[in-house]
Amino acid sequence: MFWKLPLLLGLLALGPHVCSWMFEDIGKTGQEFSMCVEFAIHHFNEHQPDENAYKLLWVRRSQHKKFSLTYLMDLHLGRTICKKHDEDIDNCPLQEGPEGKKVNCTFIVDSRPLYTKFTLLNSTCQQI
């Protein structure tokens, strides 16, 4: 029975350190976060079969892991009239009517801005 007490105390001591690796809210305008958003949208456009490009409509959630450069983002994307390899997709008009698809995506991106290296750890998207 008493052998459980040191184990419990050890778990209590580790609790804050374990929780520190959870995602926490951050601002949507930070430079590293913005670069990760750009990378995630580029990756989405490159790996989806549609030849039209999607662009960012708004950021629904912006978070990062404490003490790391791993970012979690929920993005709302809209289908444009531009092709995915066109220049300046951000200024491209959205498609109207039944072709005007929108998707909600969640991306987890690990960044190494010093090396300009980004890695997509996970992504899920759902058409709305």
Curated annotation (Swiss-Prot):
Subcellular location: Secreted
Keywords tagged on the record: Disulfide bond, Glycoprotein, Protease inhibitor, Secreted, Signal, Thiol protease inhibitor
Listed GO CC annotations: extracellular region
Glycan attachment positions: 104
Broad class of where this protein is predominantly found: secreted
Signal peptide interval: 1-20
Disulfide bonds listed in the record: 82-92, 105-125
GO molecular function, one term: cysteine-type endopeptidase inhibitor activity
Matches recorded under InterPro entries: Cystatin_dom, Cystatin_sf, Cystatin_spermatogenesis
Family, as annotated: Belongs to the cystatin family.
Name listed for the protein in its UniProt record: Probable cystatin-15
Organism: Bos taurus
